[in-house]
């Protein structure tokens, strides 16, 4: 059976807190390794004395969760358990048996969001409903477990973009996809009629995935990707941020400053119950703030005050 694997870096000082958090949210197993292994800074721990438990200064922790676990739910629970720890560098992946990837490809079917937006894996024929001039079709690799449209946070954003396109508020507009991941939202926005898009993410692999998906969908000339520190300071008519509630709170000033007067914003990655604080956080800059729910997840959207 597959497992969800979490990896993070910590110090000997913060290790107990990370360990307590992982145990609390249901980790099946936790292992620790020297983060400097196979480098000149590697330190061997051979035979500790009685009652001693020496550890490395820098550690890599790996935790396993049940394969049915939702990575974003796990991460949100960890942040809620100990918000004082830095969870921003946590990485997830599926530890799978040899048949998992093929099973995922078979399970990942074409999906429709709103009236005209379709996410279609490359190994599937185009659905009849998507084979129209009005349809916005994004083709994705079925191996992408996250940012593929299957998670509620992504689905909430895709439906929002589709509704903007339906009301004519996306045609010819500039778009910022903050925390772009696979780039699915930026690519979908371009397919729906946006003039140009910028993807921002702190993971270089995410930027590569976004650029690759843009190229494969024929919109690479309209999309540029940046690390957060390299993003040009400018405003956009449409901003979408599908990250976690803690990051949305911390980045409120930054995200608000990126939205042009009269522009639209959508915030996702918010668990039900976290929306009230974020509504208050963004109220100084945005009117018409409203929420939409999909199972345990919420989206907030609004209009930038002039």
From Swiss-Prot:
Q: Name one GO biological process term.
A: methylation
Q: Which SUPFAM superfamilies match?
A: S-adenosyl-L-methionine-dependent methyltransferases
For this protein, the record's InterPro entries field holds:
Ribosomal_L11_MeTrfase_PrmA, Ribosomal_PrmA_MeTrfase, SAM-dependent_MTases_sf
Query: What Pfam families does the annotation carry?
Result: PrmA
Q: Which positions bind S-adenosyl-L-methionine?
A: 154, 179, 201, 242
Q: Which CDD domains match?
A: AdoMet_MTases (cd02440)
Source domain of life is Bacteria
Q: Single GO cellular component annotation?
A: cytosol
Q: Which family does it belong to?
A: Belongs to the methyltransferase superfamily. PrmA family.
Q: Which HAMAP family match?
A: Methyltr_PrmA
NCBIfam families (UniProt xref): prmA (TIGR00406)
PANTHER family, alphabetized = ELECTRON TRANSFER FLAVOPROTEIN BETA SUBUNIT LYSINE METHYLTRANSFERASE
- Name of the protein described by the UniProt record: Ribosomal protein L11 methyltransferase
- Which species does this protein come from? Xanthomonas euvesicatoria pv. vesicatoria (strain 85-10) (Xanthomonas campestris pv. vesicatoria)
